[in-house]
């Protein structure tokens, strides 16, 4: 964010656009890595944390909200660094108004789910408006192809994870099934995200072992 603000106020449009795209793509990547876990293992998480499978089902059903929430957080930070505090306040009020309307009008149809629907509307509206404003400020936001590759990887992970989880749950007890499913999902994500050119496993491993070797040399 400090580097983005410096380039913005110096009028370096190309650098600002590149930094913005990199930040948004990184945010989407992190959210995309977490999504299959929550969708596939949401019920297990609910049982583990709250001893309630229904709460876990709600986690799985609302996992997609993680994407607009993440985008809102990073976009708001970047816009504020560009001096757009008034705009981000207006966007926040628009999203909050939509959430309030949902919580007032939807309980009769959705019950307690009205609050979740309101939060989803709030996140989607604020994320969309923030991205539109970022595009206007930076002059570029070319992330369409990246989003398609990320979506394909996430959907494939979920498609593989759901039957794997069902199989493990049928033949294993709760905790072993949960653990095995998580490991299978992690392996599927590494494979599919690499195939979609979303992550570079070799680079990540080199950085990891380089940091470890530096720590060992410092200690010695």
Locate each region found by the language model.
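Short alpha-helical transmembrane segments in multi-pass integral membrane proteins
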Residues: 23-40, 109, 113-138, 150-154, ...
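Residue-level recognition of transmembrane alpha-helices
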Residues: 27, 59-62, 66, 92-93, ...
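Membrane-embedded alpha-helical segments of multi-pass transporters/permeases
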Residues: 35-40, 48, 61, 100, ...
